[in-house]
């Protein structure tokens, strides 16, 4: 019977030295009592013993288990049976915590790291880091070159996955083991994967797919993107235009050397990689030197095909990451391409180079991304056509361009056919077609930030054409010193359409926006040539443009400054939410007066001009207010109320009568009825009130002589008077109840009760 493979839980029982906090205990142990797998009965018994005795005395617990040491019991409980252990999937917070702890303590102190993660042990943290969180671990799909290395190494080493992992940097032993057991072993044993017979067929299949990809991509570009750019969209390889045949043989031999060196399981792999790097760099320099010399000899005779080359000096490290495409155009004068372009092309076989480059980990991931979705990588619209200029409006798609080149290179006429608003506006002249050189810059696969792409405003009286004149002509002069005759687009297509009409002719003095003129004439322009431009208000689409609006003018509401927001947030975070404190009554009184003045339009309160005089008068009145003990308002208060409600021109008799009547209104009806017989006492009270009114009148006259102004009450508030005079419904009910109570009281006792103020 075949031996059953051990699970990860069983491996955990045997590999004690995986945890650094257990090494000292293992050294003290001379003999492990029983290394047999724990049974279910032993696990249940250990759980009960731990529940009864705790986790402090493992020697006592081990005495109840046969052939188990205290260390074995502790290890089994802490690593397997503890219910607090978390064996589920890792959360994002746990992953982030592991990354921070590894940066702090290093990737070896897993027991210390596990103490900061509740429910996780050191082995879990170690496996999580090495298999998933380590940034050096490759998570891309497996390549055929990696499969071949695993296949050859497994034939020699067997299941020694740690040794095999050393041959594949970026792959862990666990991932290699899982890949072999899940996929590779079945394909090798049943389908004959990586055998000699299937190798040639796989190469033929790869070459056929590489040959088919450009056609699919061309249809996609022509139909979907409205760009007609016949660019080879297969995986970029070294293709240089060189007149020497020896370079082709030299590069082919180097590719064969690379392929042979990586097929064999050679321990000197790194040394051969360095030799390959030097070989490729020397080949590249030689090709460039010969190409520059040929360009200096025959400058007008440029290549009639599209050449892709790598312009980065360090070719080995940047081939898969940075790829620049340079397009060159032919002089279309009715002659064939072979007559004008004597150059030959270095076209290394695609499979030879790809199979060698895929064995290098730096290139495998990038090549897989390109192979997985060729349509997306060949989609020119997904890349930014200009790095330094951002178009304010959406650029119109370009369709086709024809170039008519003169024999003397005196004029270069450019006419374009564009797609505007779904309609084709054609202005094509000439007989031969050439491609509009919209060169995508593929060295950066992301659009730069908007701050870096903002367009500088043009100075007054200067057009975009004038700025481009010097640069384009200088490029035509210095083209012999560069390795490419065409530069990337320095403009926005909308800028081209806004300044150029459909039938406009261009020459060397007034060049186009799109490319370097195809001519060898050297012209020095010292004075910028101003072009006659149409004023903005006379343009056809001037009324349909969206006006530029500053963002600061859009929001009319006041906004809290950012520093104040930050300070307020910090205060709330530190001291809690802010609370409103009670204001003094003086401030509240002022606020109420302002609100009432805004609503009513008049100030119903006293307007003070001399505060000292008003305070002196107020102090004299306050002494009499302190003796108020009952609900009945005394005559002094009524006199003061009458002084506020009426003008100071009224006579003494009117005020005294008013004070007397208002005082009677506030007295309960029962008390008035009972005291009718006591007229002498009432007369005495009236006399005393008259005397008091006379005294108050003198004081009011003194205050009025010191410019204290009293405002008239324009309209009496009847609701307020009803409340004050006790005429509301509830007040009348209370008054009636009080009258009945006093009637019953006076019926029992004949003696009258005097009101003491």
From Swiss-Prot:
Region annotation Disordered: where it falls in the sequence: 187-209
Primary residence: nucleus
SUPFAM superfamilies attached to this UniProt entry: Homeodomain-like
Pfam family, one: Myb_DNA-bind_6
Matching InterPro entries: C-myb_C, Homeodomain-like_sf, Myb_dom, MYB_TF, SANT/Myb, Tscrpt_reg_Wos2-domain
Chain intervals with Polar residues compositional bias: 197-209
A biological-process GO annotation: mitotic cell cycle
GO MF, any single term: RNA polymerase II cis-regulatory region sequence-specific DNA binding
Record localization: Nucleus
CDD domains listed in its UniProt record: SANT (cd00167)
Gene Ontology cellular component annotations, sorted alphabetically: nucleus
Expression (tissue specificity): Expressed ubiquitously.
Description of how the protein assembles with itself and partners: Component of the DREAM complex.
Listed name of the protein: Myb-related protein A
Native organism: Gallus gallus
Gene expressing this chain: MYBL1
